C-alpha cells in the first residue's frame, strides 16, 4: 500500500481517501483493488488523533505501518523520517496511469521508476517485496499469460511451462476467474526472504513485470547476486530502497494538510 501511495502524487496518504459521489479516488483504481489493511490504518490514525490530535499525518502513519509490518513478518528494519503532510487530491485515473502495471515490460518499468527518481537497483529491491505478495487470477493481472498471451489462445513462452500448467490446474482454471488468490512466492509468502527472486530466475515470476527483470543484463545479474548472497545483504539493501522510496515527492511545510481522518480531506 505504501508503494502504491508513493507512486501517485508522492507519499502523501492519498491512497487512503474514499471516493465520493463526484470523485473516483485512488482506492477505486484497478491496481489498488487488491490492497488490504485500510481499516487497520484508519484505526491507527484514530488512536494517534486521540493521543496527539493534528500532529501525525496519514502519510506518516502509512509509512511507519509498512515498515513495522515488514519487521513483524521477519523482514528488515529501516528508518522512517517523519514530517510528511497529507495530500488533498486522490484520483483513480492518476493511480491507473502512475502505478506500474503487472503487464509492464522492462522499458515500461524503467521509465515508471525513473519518473519517481528511482533507479534499476531500486526496481529490483522494491520488487522483492513480492516475496510476501499475493495477487488474483484474471486477465488484468496475469491469466492472459496462461490462456491468451498474444490474443491467439496461447501461453507466454517466458513462463515456465510446468508452473503454468500447475496454475491452470489448481488456481486459475479459466481466463475469466478474477477472484482466486495466488501467492507470488509459493510456499513461503509469509516469510520475508529471497524466495521471490529464486522464482523469477526459474521463470516463475507471475507477472510479466516480474519476468521482465530477467530481460536486462544489469537487473538479471543483480538478482543473481542477491540470491547467491546472505539474506542479510538483501535486507540491508531493501531497507535502503524503502527509505529512499519513502521520500518520493513528499509534502512538507505548508503544502497539504494533516488529515483528521484518513478517508476524507479536512473540511
Regions found by a protein language model. Name each.
Residues 1-267:
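Catalytic cores of secreted/periplasmic or lumenal enzymes
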